[in-house]
UniProtKB/Swiss-Prot annotation:
This is Serine--tRNA ligase. Consists of two distinct domains, a catalytic core and a N-terminal extension that is involved in tRNA binding. Signal peptide: none annotated. L-serine binds at residues 256-258, 310, 410. It comes from Xanthomonas oryzae pv. oryzae (strain MAFF 311018). It is found in: Cytoplasm. ATP binds at residues 287-289, 374-377. It is an enzyme of class 6 (ligase). Its EC number is 6.1.1.11. GO terms for cellular component: cytoplasm. Pathway: Aminoacyl-tRNA biosynthesis; selenocysteinyl-tRNA(Sec) biosynthesis; L-seryl-tRNA(Sec) from L-serine and tRNA(Sec): step 1/1. The lineage of its organism: Bacteria, Pseudomonadati, Pseudomonadota, Gammaproteobacteria, Lysobacterales. Belongs to the class-II aminoacyl-tRNA synthetase family. Type-1 seryl-tRNA synthetase subfamily. It catalyses: tRNA(Ser) + L-serine + ATP = L-seryl-tRNA(Ser) + AMP + diphosphate + H(+); tRNA(Sec) + L-serine + ATP = L-seryl-tRNA(Sec) + AMP + diphosphate + H(+). InterPro entries: aa-tRNA-synt_IIb, aa-tRNA-synth_II, aa-tRNA-synth_II/BPL/LPL, Ser-tRNA-ligase_type_1, Ser-tRNA-synth_1_N, SerRS_1_N_sf, SerRS_core, tRNA-bd_arm.
Amino acid sequence: MLDPALLRQHPADLAERLRSTRGFALDTAKLESLESERKHMQVRTQELQSLRNSKSKAIGQAKAKGEDVAALMAEVAGVGDELLHSHGRLTVVQHELEKIYAVIPNLPHADVPLGKSEADNVEQSRWGTPRQFDFPVKDHVELGAPNGWLDGETAVKLSGARFTVLRGPIARLHRALAQFMLDLHVGEHGYEETNVPLLVNADSMRGTGQLPKFEDDLFRIYENEYEGHTDEETGESFYTPTGGVDPDPAYYLIPTSEVPLTNIVRDEIIDAERLPLRMTAHSMCFRAEAGSGGRDTRGMIRQHQFEKVELVTACAPEDSDAEHQRMTRCAEVVLEQLGLPYRKVLLCTGDMGFSAIKTYDLEVWLPSQNTYREISSCSNCGDFQARRMQARWRNPVSGKLELLHTLNGSGTAVGRAMIAVMENYQNADGSIDVPQVLRPYMGGIERIG
């Protein structure tokens, strides 16, 4: 969330910046009208509270003197009614303002190039040279399906579209990749391994910015409503379903472990000595892919359920730029140790995520598509998420509480890494060489198939 003070002080300037960089239309007239009413209702509520307190004090003094207090009590009752109305309206106005604040995207860093789509992203560097094949290249489906290692048909029977069943050596390769990534980030990059829930509450989703804007892309878990009873003989309590369902989701399936990892610092005050906090987790991720249409329907490129190794950092504001470079480099090392050609891209203003001020994407080379595809996205979110979460640290110089900066990145997507390994390490006979760094995780196997 942007600083409400900035929105109050410079609404027109911020509206123009949001329009030109994010394509976001801020209704400044509505914002200023609500802010004016908020100020008025806040002053009026405080005046009424003061008036009620003074009249209540007068009642006590009058009673002590034995005077009739009926008129004063009637006045206090009237003030109380007006206070109730004033406070209620203030609450409504504040809620309306919060709804506006909640859907405003973060402002890009000055280094971020202006643009509307991925076509305007700026390539920063490349690593590795794409392999030249002397035989027809197969995609990951053609490599995995004939042996039953990659089974989309069974997944459709079990669940539906955009799911995959992995078997045998490909399932083992998938697991090996996740283990390799975790070991690298924990053992060499200094991240703390963390095991997080896959189900989180709405506060967690709001904290990292998934709610309210992206609710349609989330899987929601609803709870049945129950009615309480007491056994007349034993006195024990028990519950039976009413047949109804609670209208609000009890939980959300995480779209990325960024959500639970980042929310670990929600409502916390972190000592400066503990910073930076660097955390990593390997988890399932779940996305409805509501806006993906018919894109990437073949194979495992875009799934409802997939696995990812996530990197999250919480740090002091002055360190976030350096931490962003460091995090991105940690993800690059994964691809380099796997021997996968990739390129690093700086996202333009129109292609960045909602919460980010600056994002680097790493795109891995897929021979079957003759192009680079995203495998990691590393973002600096500044204090945007921290303000929503009230995640703070105590500045040892000033002694004051300040908002943390939060960062997140994929280190990397496991399924896409598996696809890249399969395609880049394929042989003419359909077999797949196992990258050197993965062989200890594969029982020494050097080739699949």
